[in-house]
């Protein structure tokens, strides 16, 4: 999380997450803020938002899809915390209050916070992820959040926005990325190699973003494979299907969804053992 403030007294917090390690790592305590911008629904960006709302009555601003998926992520975080015995700074009462704290905005739609005008732009990270453009009386700032300018199977890339100040993450800033299409072909080749020798390719992947990308790649390159889809990613995908305005190719996503065999019961899980590929949530 990061607090932005200027001399007009306008103040916002951008994201407030936790690191899902064992035990989890929590951020410094946020000062009181009336408004928080949530760029997307990964737990390292939303994990502490229920605490924020419960303690400060903060309004959460995000896209409709981010708000929908966040509820699922929060409930899963609470469940895992209870099972593993790690303390969580917020409880179910905070979560319930947070669900009513959302104000959702479309891409390109201006809204006001204090003396500032703000609007979201597509970040290209996962569907619903946003960059935030902030127009103050003195300057224009763009907060990139987690962004990607490349086109991926389910979301278009971020576009350049003119600004005076650009705040951008640098996680992969010093790395040379391999060509995405080459990596996709390498994944399909390795999967087919495993299947050809009678094995089952088990692919663990993040529930929001990576699972769906992998399934789209396999569907488009090797539709003859029997692929089973398990874990929380199935529920995330349902939210995507209900918010198709954030999807690059909704028709392609629907076709993949019908093609993949969803694991919804113990008997489905037994059947999956005979599949060619199992794509499931990490852990």
Region spans (language model):
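His/Asp/Glu-rich metal-coordinating catalytic cores
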Residues: 2-37, 42-46, 51-220, 224-226
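Hard-cation-handling environments
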Residues: 188-283
